[in-house]
């Protein structure tokens, strides 16, 4: 018997590339249960374990295929506890025409349509472009004639992946500038200025040569996970201390995941580079599915009306420990550190809020205690 397409997928693991749209929520766009009666050409098949309670209890098989110019996925769910099997067909995205190719100072990048970026000249010449964003922002590395580099985040241009309204992207980036000022910290990227320009809004930050933990940057991710264990321990403590600082200032982290964490190897500095969606507490889930990566999101971040607070962030920070030390694998077998530290991380990612640590400071204290016992 096949369950209906409204069955919600577990979110303890995510496939490479973080295909969160299909992994973490009910099928969209009229997803149907198996049977399909749709002709398709198989592209690839990958199996992923979903780790629950420290053992492999649920398995997914994800197959991508194309139907009439659209990209779809089938998702085979096998629950080893209940013996239920189901196949879901999910429309992933419309196939679009090749995006417009823009060029600035010899650097090519993708856009949905032409746009005038001449306002960037006030900061110098573009040497790097980050165009693969779905937030409505496009980011630039710009260097002036004296060699000073800055990072410019801009909203208001027709980026290749954004499907929302230009005005929403501008409002979001404008609002975020206040967060960087309110949470100024040695481990947060420094905001230089944020203002209207180029028909949109730009925030200008100090440049950093730090490498990113995020999987969307494979070479940097590979370099990050090869850092010595002690270095990654320092990175994790820095993340905990910053989130504790933010909580004391009255903020809850939203959209905190591996791609927001960087490490400057030369200066031995952890850098948090994106707090755009942090919120002032008290706050609740008003979206149904909050911004974020499925590998880091707590159950309440999928529940409309649920409270979002420090306990929510305890879950995310537990998930961050698994990202830093075991490539997001939550099994005891994959954990390279002590069993005491594993117990701390595992408690933090408990599905039930009451089973987690009651605050970020409590998580930090438990981690430091377990670390001390290891030495």
Please place each PLM-identified region on the residue numbering.
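Activation segment/activation loop of eukaryotic-type protein kinase catalytic domains
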Residues: 264-291
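Short beta-strand micro-motifs within the conserved protein kinase catalytic domain, predominantly
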Residues: 190-201
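Catalytic-loop of the protein kinase fold
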Residues: 243, 247-263
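ATP-binding glycine-rich loop module of kinase domains
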Residues: 136-172, 178
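Conserved activation segment of eukaryotic-like protein kinases, specifically the C-terminal portion
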Residues: 287-301
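Conserved short submotifs of the Hanks-type protein kinase catalytic core
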Residues: 199-212
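Juxta-kinase regulatory segment immediately upstream of eukaryotic protein kinase catalytic domains
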Residues: 86-125
